[in-house]
Amino acid sequence: MPTLPGSLTLVKGIKPQPLVSLANFTSWRVGGPAEWFASPSSVEELQTLIAWAYEQKMPCRVIGAGSNLLINDTGLPGLSLCMRKLQGSDLDPKTGIVEALAGEPIPNLSKRAAKVGLHGLEWAVGIPGTVGGAAVMNAGAQGGCTADWLESVQVLDLNGEGPFELSRQELDYAYRQSLLQEKTLVVLSARFRLDPGHDHKELNQITQQNLTHRTTTQPYQLPSCGSVFRNPEPLKAGRLIEALGLKGHRIGGAEVSPIHANFIVNIGGATAADINQMITLIQQRVQMAHGVMLHPEVKRLGFEATA
């Protein structure tokens, strides 16, 4: 196990902790321990931690808010970084420019924008994740997505380079995809250009309607990662799964939600292995019945190479 340099212990709050269970930091509530774990509360702390991992020649992973991750029960080697403390945002009601740190919850930003008459993020009110995660995954709902409104991101390279800016055009956005998923880059912050001058009451109403729709049509009462599979446009993954009668199907503590078939929920005592097995089962069944291979939205860490 690597040793901690004295410089890290001098900066309050950033000393990495050994063997921390990652189940407490994922929305599925599963996953083994991180070899080293830290939750930076500033960009400077994050840079220090990334530099330490690079010097130690260890893997370094950002787990964001853990809402779109499945982490193996055996845990993860190297340094795992939780971004939940890296919060903050600045909204300009006149220009529509919004700056937000990577750990800022995207639902909070959606609500704040609506309150000051900025249109563009109403769809994001029910997304269980952070600004950084939304930028990486091109998160979307209700007919909107991150790429529609994001102008640029500030990133660091895990090799120690940066920070530097990437424009929306440079991010190669597509449905639930971006360049950020392929590179060793960590999102520090994002800039959005929203549409100013709207009636805040109307935007608040739309935001509330979107939230109500999501909470009544999706299983918010149990731990999940949100939608498991990308929609194979123009088809819907949930409908393909439901057509096979898989709603309510269980493997250990993992269940295909009876409310929405594109959600796998932890009904209690689930393991990452249970959930991973369920993902594979659904892929096999759907391909056999419909001739369609479903590709997960969720990122699986610590597993063998998967589709």
UniProtKB/Swiss-Prot annotation:
Keywords: Cell cycle, Cell division, Cell shape, Cell wall biogenesis/degradation, Cytoplasm, FAD, Flavoprotein, NADP, Oxidoreductase, Peptidoglycan synthesis. The keyword Cell division applies. InterPro entries: FAD-bd_PCMH (IPR016166), FAD-bd_PCMH-like_sf (IPR036318), FAD-bd_PCMH_sub1 (IPR016167), FAD-bd_PCMH_sub2 (IPR016169), MurB (IPR003170), MurB_C (IPR011601), MurB_C_sf (IPR036635), Oxid_FAD_bind_N (IPR006094). It comes from the Bacteria. It catalyses: UDP-N-acetyl-alpha-D-muramate + NADP(+) = UDP-N-acetyl-3-O-(1-carboxyvinyl)-alpha-D-glucosamine + NADPH + H(+). It is found in: Cytoplasm. GO terms for cellular component: cytosol. Pathway: Cell wall biogenesis; peptidoglycan biosynthesis. GO terms for molecular function: FAD binding; UDP-N-acetylmuramate dehydrogenase activity. Its EC number is 1.3.1.98. Belongs to the MurB family. Cell wall formation. This is UDP-N-acetylenolpyruvoylglucosamine reductase. The gene is murB.
